[in-house]
Swiss-Prot record:
Entry keyword annotation includes Transmembrane: yes
Designated gene of the protein: TNFSF14
Upper lineage: Eukaryota, Metazoa, Chordata, Craniata, Vertebrata
Alphabetic keyword roster: Cell membrane, Cytokine, Cytoplasm, Disulfide bond, Glycoprotein, Membrane, Secreted, Signal-anchor, Transmembrane, Transmembrane helix
Post-translational modifications reported in the UniProt record: N-glycosylated.
Keyword Disulfide bond: yes
GO terms for biological process, alphabetical: apoptotic process; cell surface receptor signaling pathway; cellular response to mechanical stimulus; immune response; positive regulation of canonical NF-kappaB signal transduction; positive regulation of extrinsic apoptotic signaling pathway; positive regulation of myoblast differentiation; positive regulation of myoblast fusion
Disulfide bonds: 154-187
Tissue distribution of the protein: Predominantly expressed in the spleen but also found in the brain. Weakly expressed in peripheral lymphoid tissues and in heart, placenta, liver, lung, appendix, and kidney, and no expression seen in fetal tissues, endocrine glands, or nonhematopoietic tumor lines.
Extracellular membrane side: 59-240
Site residues by UniProt (Cleavage): 82-83
Family affiliation: Belongs to the tumor necrosis factor family.
Domain of life according to the entry: Eukaryota
GO annotation, cellular component aspect: cytoplasm; extracellular space; plasma membrane
The species this protein was found in: Homo sapiens
Name of the protein described by the UniProt record: Tumor necrosis factor ligand superfamily member 14
Length: 240
């Protein structure tokens, strides 16, 4: 009896077996993930840089606030007022206002003398010597002067006009230099020898003055100058 032999079915496919097998779509997904990671890294880097810059500015602000606190006075309110006054003193410009006094009329032909402390008079950043305002800081100054004039009739021996002027003394020139001058005649106002007349002369203008230069007021025939409580005749200057 013959043995039955079972033979498996074998299918042989003849073809090229050296072609590599590749899976579609895998490399494209890897490239997309790499780009996303790079973008996320750049975003995190920018956020870190922004936080670092913000921290630096906050640290600078903290240091500056500490410096300001150390400069502030620790005393009472008077210290604050003193600090404010000191700061204002550095900011204000030189100024002076001088008033007429009984000693203004020297009778010697020199410049008029002035009160520097009493009443409305003050000096700030300028000095005073023998009727002259002495400039301590070069610059442009508005200088002014007013004198009250008065008398009875036409004064004997009076020239044709009364001269009221502001003059500058400078080391660079031996004589006084005219800055502002006014001339007027009171005799035209006095129609009779017994009539009382009043008048005033005001001068004001901007001039350039150097440190060390002086400004004085002169009135030819000063016996006509009238003084009263420092409001009728005065002299001053301030930097502009």
């Amino acid at each position: 009896m013959e043995e039955s032999v079972v033979r498996p079915s074998v299918f042989v496919v003849d073809g090229q077996t050296d072609i590599p097998f590749t899976r579609l779509g895998r490399s494209h997904r890897r490239q997309s993930c790499s780009v996303a990671r790079v973008g996320l890294g750049l975003l995190l880097l920018l956020m870190g840089a922004g936080l670092a810059v913000q921290g630096w500015f906050l640290l600078q602000l903290h240091w500056r606030l500490g410096e300001m606190v150390t400069r502030l006075p620790d005393g009472p309110a008077g210290s604050w007022e003193q600090l404010i006054q000191e700061r204002r003193s550095h900011e204000v410009n030189p100024a002076a206002h001088l008033t007429g006094a009984n000693s203004s009329l020297t009778g010697s032909g020199g410049p008029l003398l002035w009160e520097t402390q009493l009443g409305l008079a003050f000096l700030r950043g300028l000095s005073y010597h023998d009727g002259a305002l002495v400039v301590t800081k070069a610059g442009y100054y508005y200088i002014y002067s007013k004198v009250q004039l008065g008398g009875v009739g036409c004064p004997l021996g009076l020239a044709s006009t009364i001269t009221h002027g502001l003059y500058k003394r400078t080391p660079r020139y031996p004589e006084e230099l005219e800055l502002l001058v006014s001339q007027q005649s009171p005799c035209g106002r006095a129609t009779s020898s017994s009539r009382v007349w009043w008048d005033s002369s005001f001068l004001g203008g901007v001039v350039h003055l150097e440190a060390g230069e002086k400004v004085v007021v002169r009135v030819l025939d000063e016996r006509l100058v009238r003084l009263r409580d420092g409001t009728r005749s005065y002299f001053g200057a301030f930097m502009v």
